[in-house]
């Protein structure tokens, strides 16, 4: 069962849990679930570096998770806790894009060989729990 975006836009804990509960309900026993979410940490860095937002605004968005009443940001740890509360088994909780947002112009200018190296790095980095929160997007994959 894929939940690819609902957690981006539901601001209350109750609404996010309701969406996740519905995914669990329709998932067969032993089935696989995937929940996509936005990371607070990576989005903080992106806002500071690429969007040149004021630090006051960045701190308010970070603390609340609310970005312009459009997006909700969370952490890998918070998503893990929600999934544990639903008795789900975590298989992976990965960072999807990591720090690629810091160098989009550099990525666009890469040769095919350089880009292949970057993709190899991204695959390895996605599984590294120490840097998962630095990614803009997270993906929790688990089993019912």
Regions found by a protein language model. Name each.
Residues 2:
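A conserved beta-strand element that flanks and buttresses the S-adenosyl-L-methionine
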Residues 5-9:
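Short catalytic micro-motifs in class I SAM-dependent methyltransferases
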Residues 11, 28, 144:
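Short conserved AdoMet
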Residues 11-14, 46:
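Conserved catalytic-core motifs of eukaryotic protein kinase domains, centered on the activation segment
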Residues 17-32:
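A short glycine-rich, Lys/Arg-flanked "PGG" loop and its adjoining helix->strand segment in the class I
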Residues 32-60:
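Conserved class I S-adenosyl-L-methionine
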Residues 68-87, 93:
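Short alpha-helix
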Residues 91-144:
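A C-terminal cap/extension of S-adenosyl-L-methionine-dependent methyltransferases
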């Amino acid at each position: 069962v894929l939940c690819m975006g609902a957690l981006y836009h539901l601001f209350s804990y109750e609404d996010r849990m309701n969406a996740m509960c519905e995914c669990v309900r329709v998932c067969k026993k032993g089935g696989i679930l995937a929940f996509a979410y936005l990371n607070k940490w990576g989005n903080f860095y992106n806002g500071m570096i690429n969007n040149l937002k004021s630090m006051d605004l960045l701190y308010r968005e970070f603390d609340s998770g609310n970005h312009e009443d459009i997006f909700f940001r969370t952490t890998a740890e918070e998503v893990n806790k929600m999934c544990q509360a639903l008795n789900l088994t975590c298989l992976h909780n990965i960072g999807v894009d990591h720090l690629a947002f810091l160098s989009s112009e550099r990525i666009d200018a890469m040769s095919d060989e350089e880009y292949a190296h970057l993709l190899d790095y991204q695959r390895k980095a996605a599984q590294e729990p120490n840097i998962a929160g630095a990614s803009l997007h997270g993906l929790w994959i688990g089993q019912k």
